[in-house]
A protein has these predicted regions:
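N-terminal periplasmic/intermembrane-space "pro-region" immediately following the signal or transit peptide
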Residues: 38-119, 132-133, 145-153, 159
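Residue-level signature of outer-membrane beta-barrel architecture
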Residues: 109, 146-149, 207, 264-267, ...
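Repeated loop/turn-to-beta-strand initiation elements of outer-membrane beta-barrel proteins
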Residues: 114, 152-156, 211-215, 269-273, ...
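Transmembrane beta-strands of outer-membrane beta-barrel pores
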Residues: 120-128, 162-168, 221-225, 267-269, ...
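Outer-membrane beta-barrel translocator/channel fold
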Residues: 166-197, 315-324, 345-365, 375-406
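Surface-exposed coil loops of outer-membrane beta-barrel proteins
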Residues: 169-302
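Outer-membrane beta-barrel "beta-signal"
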Residues: 409, 443-459
């Protein structure tokens, strides 16, 4: 089944606009590369209406900033603005507007507001059981964005995101029951793959169409389509969890996509959007930009009834996402609800991954981060997933689906380092529930633990 075909005149115009976005995104990457390595972006509180000459509201979207500084002045932001029903997650996704603040670098330069966030995360993990392994590694991310008015109720946002995780082994790091993508032509099992150098190079234009409502167009050579909740690196509910979810390829594996165009309508309490994008996941060559194409599609509706809540439902038809299953497409249905305030962030999500042809594999996720006082943080994640990729070809259990549950809990203590930086020290442990048929491969009761030090520009 293919997505609906656009008339040739409309299609030509979209492709022309998409090429322009790629040029703009490339210029943005060179212009706004500054010290920032971003994960926990949530941008609640920046009232674009406070910026000189700007009537930017992105549908009353706030970015959690102090009032704009004087040109050339650097600042941090730390106020929570509960008046905005939503904040920005990854791509065009929304998260609760009152999830709490984060710090970051902000500079005014003429009409431009430049923003930077990021982290370098030193991690050691020891995944137990017969198929476990241990590894010391560094995760990293850098994000820089730039915004300015274009006049006549239009605004431009340039977005870039980078990672040095390609320096990691192609096999990534140990993560029991995680699957997806390849290393040296072999499917990754019980491993989490590294991210690409280029995680986002995109631009977004918002145009006022009614009081409190905008139409927007987002796209670029690297971006994220309108599918699933905000990616796990951008959810405050997982801000100190150093392990990727084992359900990553059910919910947010499209967060690095080579070729994306998204159009939508955004208002204070809802957003409706549709995307065309490349379905194939990134290959093993993590340093370059793969050839963009638009062979897949998705739609997403998001509801933000108050600053504390954000809910989304989305569906995508993905063309041949996995290199080792070249003849399989995927129909992915996701639904999620997020809650946030200045102390607590929670995400609950469901996904049904329909292999075409093949079975429907479902997954559930519940994760939270609680900041009871000061720098103390308690976090946890529970995942339940039906996975048929736990055994490679040639093994008797290859292709058989097993439902497994991962239960993880951890603690982190954040130490402020001046106004802009912070250091979080912590760790987590994980237990698993699985069918007895997996005892021979994984052991009866595998246990994993992780320790980390996370240096952040912003938080």
């Amino acid at each position: 089944m293919e997505g609906p075909r656009l008339p040739d005149c409309v299609s030509d115009r979209i492709f022309t606009m998409n090429r322009r976005y790629w040029r703009v995104a490339a210029i943005a990457a060179a212009t706004i590369s500054m010290p920032a390595m971003a994960q926990d972006m949530d941008h609640n509180g920046m009232d674009h209406g406070q910026m000189d000459g700007m009537s930017m509201d992105h549908g009353q979207m706030n970015h959690d900033m102090t009032p704009a500084p004087s040109p050339g002045e650097e600042t941090e932001h730390h106020e929570v603005n509960d008046s905005s029903p939503f904040a920005t997650g990854s791509g065009t996704a929304r998260v609760p507007g009152a999830e709490g603040s984060m710090h970051g670098l902000h500079i005014m330069s003429g009409d431009w507001m430049l923003m930077a966030h990021g982290y370098a995360w030193g991690v050691y993990t020891d995944q137990g059981g017969a198929r476990g392994d241990d590894k010391a590694y560094v995760q990293s991310m850098l994000m820089a964005t730039a915004e300015r008015p274009l006049g006549d109720g239009a605004r431009l946002t340039l977005k870039s995101m980078f990672s040095l995780e390609p320096l990691m082994s192609a096999r990534g790091y140990p993560n029991l029951f995680a699957t997806g993508e390849t290393a040296n032509g072999i499917g990754l099992i019980d491993r989490q793959h590294p991210h690409d150098l280029f995680m986002e190079l995109a631009a977004r234009i918002d145009v006022d169409i009614a009081p409190g409502a905008t139409a927007f167009l987002y796209g670029g050579p690297v971006g994220e389509p309108a599918l699933g909740p905000s990616a796990f690196m951008m959810r405050r509910s997982s801000r100190y969890n150093a392990e990727a979810p084992i359900t990553h390829h059910w919910f947010d594996s499209t967060h690095i996509t080579y070729g994306v165009v998204t159009a939508g309508v955004s208002a204070s309490r809802f957003q409706i959007e549709a995307s065309a994008f490349r379905g194939r996941e990134p290959d093993e060559e993590r340093w370059g930009i793969e050839t963009p194409k638009l062979d897949s599609w998705s739609v997403r509706g998001t509801w933000t009834p108050s600053p504390n809540w954000a809910a989304q439902v989305s569906y995508g038809r993905i063309k041949s996402p996995e290199a080792l299953h070249d003849d399989e497409d995927e129909g992915r249905l996701t639904a999620s609800i997020g809650y946030g305030d200045d102390r607590l962030s929670v995400t609950g999500a469901f996904s049904a991954k329909n292999r075409l042809p093949g079975p429907v594999l479902t997954a559930w996720l519940l994760e939270a981060n609680w900041n009871p006082t000061g720098g103390h943080n308690l976090f946890g994640r529970v995942e339940n997933v039906e996975n048929d990729e736990l055994f490679p070809e040639g093994e008797p259990l290859h292709g058989q689906a097993f439902r497994v549950t991962k239960m993880q809990a951890g603690y982190a203590y954040r130490i402020p380092l001046g106004k802009l930086f912070g250091l979080a020290l912590g760790g987590s442990g994980a237990l698993y529930d699985k069918p007895r048929a997996l005892d021979a491969a994984y052991g009866k009761s595998p246990f994993g633990w992780t320790a980390f030090a996370k240096l952040s520009l912003g938080d």
